[in-house]
């Protein structure tokens, strides 16, 4: 049970945070009404406002794992990494795109050491084969819905071409990396609402403190029969005398309700016991997932010096984090994992000295890699739970009702 002291401290922190938010909102509203600041500024501040008020799994006293988190407990705790979303919610359209930028410069000219692993291949992602073959990432990573992969691929390719043009470089072959989940239960996916304009907005919105929940590529996803979305988490590990960060971002769209585990608790079974009869309610029509199908895209970023082979070993442990939340990887589920490190860049031929025929890498010894394994598993588990805790309830295209994990936990109060 959570102690009275802990609950009191958490309450005091929440009150102080609310007071700070109140002062900020008054100033922000005044400036907006007076027309002092531009549209881009308002959009940025509104995003910050939403981030400040979003609930995450730790706000309910649930602390997954035992390794300390990064400053924000997000993938962007890895220096240089940024995330941007564009969300489209209009009528039957409930979808979006999310971009993960590995660093501030042109990745095509100075690729990142990378790895890709497919646990169960029910999916339509692009760009994985070249990552597996060469061990490098040369573009930002984009996430969207299944039927928009091609359109988003084209937009990412155009983004890289413009970067190369500005850098005075020629790009004749590009490997855009695009992952996907099928959001057709909530989104009219056949309308293919995401194009170049939405991808540009996601790039323009990229920052270090991204929103979670039903935003961007997570706008229309379902996880364990509840509303899913985008979630992120990070862990800090020590190798030698130096600390390194491992961050994870997920697009969650998988799992059967009955299987949901929250920090070791069989919450899914309890949800069905408490709310299961709502499925027959002609008004509420609460939806639950009976099978483990759908997908989860998992992106891991780190500044840990590793080879692409070591990185493959690390991202395979993301599957352990998925299993900790209860899933067993069903036939119709696609688990795709992509990882990159900012530590070992692989400059293209044009940026290398002509006489430089050998490449020197720094890599951790294998006997220290267990720390990274555990960090990856913990961050994945928490990222999934954050994707659900930050998402609100919604209705599907057939009128069915998808509950929010946050609402369920709020009704229970403290669960530990």
Question: What do the predicted segments below correspond to?
Answer:
Residues 7-10, 35:
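Intrinsic, low-complexity polybasic segments
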Residues 19, 27-44, 48:
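Short, positively charged and aromatic/hydrophobic N-terminal segments
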Residues 52-416:
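Alpha/propeptide regions of enzymes that mature by internal proteolysis
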């Amino acid at each position: 049970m959570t102690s009275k002291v802990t609950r009191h401290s958490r309450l005091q922190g929440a009150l102080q945070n609310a007071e700070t938010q109140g002062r900020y909102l008054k100033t922000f509203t005044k400036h907006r009404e007076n027309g002092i600041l531009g549209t881009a500024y308002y959009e940025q501040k509104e995003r910050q406002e939403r981030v400040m008020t979003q609930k995450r799994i730790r706000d309910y006293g649930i602390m997954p794992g035992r390794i300390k988190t990064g400053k924000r407990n997000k993938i962007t705790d890895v220096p240089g990494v940024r995330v941007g979303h564009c969300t489209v919610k209009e009528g039957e359209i409930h979808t979006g795109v999310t971009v993960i930028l590995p660093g501030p410069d042109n990745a095509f000219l100075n690729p990142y050491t990378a790895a890709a692993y497919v646990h169960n291949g029910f999916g339509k992602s692009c760009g994985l084969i070249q990552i597996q073959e060469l061990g490098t990432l040369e573009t930002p990573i984009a996430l969207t819905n299944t039927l928009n992969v091609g359109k988003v691929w084209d937009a990412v390719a155009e983004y890289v071409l413009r970067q190369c043009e500005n850098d005075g470089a020629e790009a004749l072959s590009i490997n855009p990396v695009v992952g996907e989940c099928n959001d057709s239960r909530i989104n009219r996916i056949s309308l293919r609402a995401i194009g170049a304009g939405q991808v540009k907005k996601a790039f323009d919105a990229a920052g270090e403190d991204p929103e979670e929940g039903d935003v961007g590529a997570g706008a229309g996803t379902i996880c364990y029969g509840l509303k899913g979305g985008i979630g992120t988490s990070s862990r800090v590990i020590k190798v030698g005398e130096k600390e390194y960060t491992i961050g994870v971002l997920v697009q969650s769209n998988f799992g059967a309700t009955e299987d949901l585990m929250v920090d070791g608790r069989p919450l899914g079974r309890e949800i069905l016991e408490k709310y299961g009869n709502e499925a027959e309610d002609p008004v509420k029509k609460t939806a639950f997932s009976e099978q483990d199908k759908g997908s989860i895209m998992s992106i891991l970023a780190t500044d840990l010096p590793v080879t692409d082979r070591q990185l493959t070993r690390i991202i395979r442990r993301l599957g352990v984090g998925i299993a900790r939340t209860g899933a067993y990887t069903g036939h119709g589920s696609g688990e795709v994992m992509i990882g990159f490190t900012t530590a070992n860049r692989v400059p293209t031929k044009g940026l290398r000295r002509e006489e430089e025929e050998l490449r020197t890498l720094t890599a951790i010894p294998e006997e220290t890699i267990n720390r990274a394994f555990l960090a990856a598993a913990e961050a994945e588990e928490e990222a999934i739970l954050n994707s659900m805790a930050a998402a609100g309830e919604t209705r599907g295209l057939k009128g069915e009702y998808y509950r929010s994990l946050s609402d369920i936990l709020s009704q229970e109060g403290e669960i530990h």
